[in-house]
UniProtKB/Swiss-Prot annotation:
NCBIfam families named among the record's database cross-references: pth (TIGR00447)
Pfam families documented for this protein: Pept_tRNA_hydro
Name of the protein described by the UniProt record: Peptidyl-tRNA hydrolase
Protein's gene: pth
Binding site for tRNA: Y14, F64, N66, N112
Record site feature (Discriminates between blocked and unblocked aminoacyl-tRNA), residues: N9
Length: 204
């Protein structure tokens, strides 16, 4: 069994925030692969079904970002899901907008959701890093991630979510690099090759 966890904050107030792109991506996967309706369990919203012939649990923790690990750990423990079968979809300041990278293990890059999961579960889970760019100054990060995507950003956000949904079977099949490459080619074909964060700030 596999666990796809999207990171974000619960409730309509945060639904459109840049910090919630992980929620958006996992919701797109659930819709694309017709998993079950969302229900409340494991301190979050869950949906179940099959992707590429394997059982998948989708989870959106409702603990708020800083406590995401509680929900992920509870679900993983209940279903005995090993770390190598856990994929965490999250916003990534250190990637330009519309870039997707996948890696197993590594640091948390200041991301409180990842920090919580690592503390609760260990480090060797997969991160699906969804680039949102950087506002240009550390002092601006908090307001940047907790603001909604602007109208000019919505096309690439939708394309990123589509890529995650369409190519999710590659993650299930143990082909993380293939997922990343196919997502890159898809986003490139859509014209999202050099997207800048709103305001022209850096995206390193």
């Amino acid at each position: 069994m596999f666990l796809f966890a999207g990171l974000g904050n619960p409730g309509p107030k945060y639904a459109g925030n840049r910090h919630n792109i992980g929620f958006m991506a996992v919701d797109a996967i659930v819709r694309r692969h017709r998993l079950s309706p969302w229900r409340r369990r494991f301190q979050g919203a869950v949906s179940e079904g099959e992707i590429a012939g394997e059982k998948v649990l989708a989870l959106l923790p409702e603990t708020f970002m800083n406590e995401s690990g509680r929900a992920v750990a509870e679900a993983a423990k209940f279903y005995k899901i090993p770390l190598e079968n856990i994929f965490v979809f999250h916003d990534e300041l250190d990637l330009p907008p519309a870039k997707i990278r996948v890696k197993k293990g590594g640091g948390n890059a200041g991301h409180n959701g990842l920090r919580s999961i690592t503390a609760q579960c260990g480090n060797d889970y997969w991160r699906v890093r969804l680039g949102i760019g950087h506002p240009g100054d550390k002092s601006l990060v908090h307001s940047y991630v907790l603001n909604d995507f602007g109208k000019a950003e919505r096309e690439w956000v939708e394309a990123v979510n589509t890529a995650c949904a369409d190519f999710a079977p590659a993650l299930i099949g143990g082909k993380a690099e293939d997922f990343q490459n196919r997502a890159h080619l898809f986003l490139e074909a859509q014209g999202f090759t050099d997207v800048k964060p709103l305001g022209g700030a850096r995206a390193s």
